């Protein structure tokens, strides 16, 4: 795909992705100003908060994409227990899944520490992208995520769901920019591109195993 076509795809996609949450924030802010019950106000506040988060993720994706293109994606390495970041994400996504009692979130953290020297925030970013996708495409069943040691010095992370699954012939395409298998789903189509690039920049490997109607497992080392 030429650079011009990529730019056109970017502009067309972003105009929709920016307008949708902005319209929701503006519209529901107006409704909240005239709301009379606390229940009504809470509902509007939740919708505004959800769209604020969506807009922030969009801005972060665009910023990271520009850094990738410029070759200046920033990494800050530190020593940490992989289980800590799993539990952090369990708290965050567990609250969100409370709204859908048909889906169970299973965090497969370990009692024994799994110490690693890597870029903690970037690993959280990748897992967050994968968990967001799992939530979007899983209406019933469960979402599992965790990590385990691979050999003596590699840590293997995974996010598995019982969602719609991805056809074999589409599995490579999902890592292309702006690609969305379901056009009706919200999102920029940048999350998996960014995730794969981050993992590769950390010297790791990124993959997917999926079967239509049974779900998907995304994994990286």
Residue ranges and their predicted role:
Residues 66-77:
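Helix-loop junction within the histidine kinase core
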Residues 27, 166-178:
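Short conserved segment of the HATPase_c
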Residues 50-55, 59:
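Short alpha-helical segment of the dimerization/phosphotransfer core of two-component systems
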Residues 134-135:
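Short helix-loop "hinge" at the ATP-lid/N-box region of the Bergerat-fold HATPase_c
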Residues 76-81, 98, 102-114, 150:
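Conserved catalytic submotifs in the C-terminal HATPase_c
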């Amino acid at each position: 795909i030429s650079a011009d076509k990529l730019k056109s795809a970017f502009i067309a996609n972003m105009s929709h992705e920016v307008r949708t949450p902005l319209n929701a924030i503006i519209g529901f802010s107006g409704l909240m100003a005239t709301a009379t019950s606390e229940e009504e106000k809470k509902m509007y506040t939740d919708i505004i908060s959800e769209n604020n988060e969506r807009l922030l993720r969009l801005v972060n994706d665009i910023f990271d994409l520009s850094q990738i293109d410029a070759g200046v994606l920033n990494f800050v390495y530190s020593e940490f227990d992989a289980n800590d970041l799993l539990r952090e994400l369990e708290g965050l996504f567990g609250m969100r899944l409370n709204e859908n009692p048909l889906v169970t979130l299973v965090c497969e953290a370990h009692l024994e520490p799994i110490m690693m020297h890597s870029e903690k925030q970037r690993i959280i970013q990748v897992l967050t992208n994968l968990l967001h996708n799992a939530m979007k495409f899983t209406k019933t069943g469960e979402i599992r995520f965790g990590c385990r040691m691979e050999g003596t010095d590699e840590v293997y992370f995974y996010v598995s769901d019982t969602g719609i699954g991805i056809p074999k012939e589409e599995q490579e395409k999902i890592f292309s920019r702006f690609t969305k298998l379901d056009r009706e789903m919200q999102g920029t189509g940048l999350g998996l591109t960014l995730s794969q690039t981050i993992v590769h920049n950390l010297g790791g490997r990124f993959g997917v195993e999926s079967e239509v109607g049974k779900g998907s497992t995304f994994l990286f080392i």
